[in-house]
Structure formats: C-alpha cells, structure tokens
Amino acid sequence: MSRKKRAPKKIPIVDYKFKSNVLPKLINSIMYDGKKTVAEKIVYDALDKLKTKGKEEPINIFNEAINNIKPTVEVRSRRVGGATYQVPVEVKSNRSQALALRWLIDASRKRKDKKMSDKIFNEIYDAYQNKGSAIKKKEDTHKMAESNKAFAHFRW
C-alpha cells in the first residue's frame, strides 16, 4: 500500500457568467495554446445562439445536452489467460462528465460549419434533442457494453 497521502480534490472553478462548474471544463478543453479568452468567446457565442434558438435558459439547455451525452457503462480491456476481453464497467460520474465533454468537442470539430462557435452550438442543440454525433458515440459505447455483457464476471 502506498505511504503517500492522497492528493486533495480540487475545488471546481465556477463560471462567472452562468455560475456553472461544467462550463470552465468545456472552455479549458476547447482552448488551444493557452488562449483562454478565445475559447471563452467561442463558448459564450455558442450559448448566446442557444438563447435566441431555445425557449429555456442556455445553461439549462447545455446541462441537459451534457446529461444526454453522459455514458453509464463503457468497456475496458481485461487480459485473462492469453485472451483479451472487453469487459463492461459502470462509469463514475466525474469520468462520464469528462467523456461527455470530450465527445461533444470531438463531434463539434468534425462538423462542416465555418465557425467553431456555430459547430459547438449545433452539436449542443443536437445533443439536447438526442441527435448528433456525440449521442451516436454514447449509443455505440452502450451497444458495445451490451454485446459484451457475457464477460461482466471478469470485472475487477
């Protein structure tokens, strides 16, 4: 057993505009080369577009979209006796949130729109309506876990 102390959990940063602790994680994930103001502008432009399109508050639409993308199970590789099995495992809440943000950004970057704010806006709105590439990624992950349910007893 390790003699070192566990690192204390970091206090989540709260967004100054929408009072959300998920939004700064999205902004930091979008950021390239330390240009945080550019990333903030992209995200806030996308949320402003959500305000004009949606009937709810944009932060509520964003949170609902993230909840729709969050996976509940995933597969992990487990080597048993020379064979590698894809074992379905439940996903912890902080990992599911991180995966949802990652899938949202990846799906946004693959879109064909001109501006990144348009890409993120469209992907968030699609996820809010249970459509889009990020939702498809979640469904593929769940299908993979479902098809490998027989190996669930290899869980660790």
Feature annotation, model-predicted:
Residues 2-33, 37, 44-156:
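Strongly charged
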